[in-house]
A protein has these predicted regions:
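A domain-level signal for the structural core that forms small-molecule/cofactor-binding pockets
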Residues: 2-74
Length: 74
């Protein structure tokens, strides 16, 4: 049975977006493995506390990710 793990910084994605991720990631797995795998495909969303995520040797707070996300959307 497929297991998909997704790690996100807490506070960047809302519940609706996380549900959409689960649906679309499951759909992607089913596209590869076949429809019979849908019922046994697990998708786990883990949220890492803001600031406990690091990149380039520095902690990355949710606010920094949201600012970048909003800049791309503009």
């Amino acid at each position: 049975m497929p297991m998909i793990n997704v790690r996100l910084i807490e506070g960047v994605f809302d519940d609706s977006q996380k549900r959409e991720m689960i649906e679309k990631l499951t759909d992607a797995m089913v596209e590869i493995e076949g429809e019979n795998m849908r019922s046994v495909t697990w998708c786990v969303v883990e949220e890492v506390k803001s600031g406990d995520w690091g990149m380039g040797g520095r902690g990355v707070p949710a606010e920094a990710v949201l600012a970048k996300k909003n800049a791309v959307a503009a």
